[in-house]
Amino acid sequence: MESSKTFMRQMPITPGYSGFVPYLSCQGTSSEDNMANCLKIFQENTRRCKDQLEEFHCSVATAPKLKPVRSEGTVLRTLHQYYRQYHPLSLECKNIKKPLHEPPIPGWAGYLPRARVTELGCSTRYTVMARNCYRDFLDLMERAKQAHLKPYEKIYGVKSTPPPPTPPPKVLLHEGLLPKYPDFSIPGARCPTLSRALMEDPRPLMTCGCPQRPSVWCSGKIYLEPLSGGKDMEG
């Protein structure tokens, strides 16, 4: 393949030319003689670089080919397996998690654990550093799982006071039928709205001379008995 020819302006330059001239800014004056000298130096340097580039291309083309470390089939098979298992755009639903000990993708410059706080990344290749960092990180995780965790009291010598026991719930035993309105039979309880004891009756007390019944307390307050069944009403 023939290389493209480099454009070279022919000497002498047209009188009155005021365009860019290489190396002219390094000269003290901008006369026509200095302009011709600058163009001549530029043409020689350009031709020399062009010859060196062609010589390099020839040496690369004639160099002996190196033997591959792995066959092309092995490389393609490995890439296909990696693509099938770990590619993020795969549409299959897999529960396979990428292991930590696998080296990252070439060119990946993400976070590596234990890379900046240890000497594992000194004077090694990136893949070797990544493998060592992940291995050390996994070892730390395994040791942390197997270590015996001491309680807080043993480490700092603090005696923890047990929480107070929960009091048992109060069970109120009532005999007979219970009304559906709030329970006013708790002694000593007060109503937050009326600001008086719940057992206190604002009406004047009614007393009678009849003999005491179970529904009448010794304090003289009269309480109605619950209604009995239909048989009692008929009788």
Swiss-Prot record:
Major subcellular site: cytoplasm
SS bond list: none
InterPro entries documented for this protein: SPMIP5, SPMIP5_dom
Top-rank lineage group of the source organism: Eukaryota
GO cellular component: cytoplasm; cytoskeleton; motile cilium; nucleus
Keyword Cytoplasm tagged: yes
Localization terms from the record: Cytoplasm, Cytoskeleton, Flagellum axoneme; Cytoplasm; Nucleus
Tissue specificity annotation: Expressed in sperm.
Assembly and oligomerization: Microtubule inner protein component of sperm flagellar doublet microtubules.
Protein function: Microtubule inner protein (MIP) part of the dynein-decorated doublet microtubules (DMTs) in flagellum axoneme. May serve to reinforce and thus stabilize the microtubule structure in the sperm flagella.
Protein name (Swiss-Prot/TrEMBL): Sperm-associated microtubule inner protein 5
Gene name linked to the record: SPMIP5
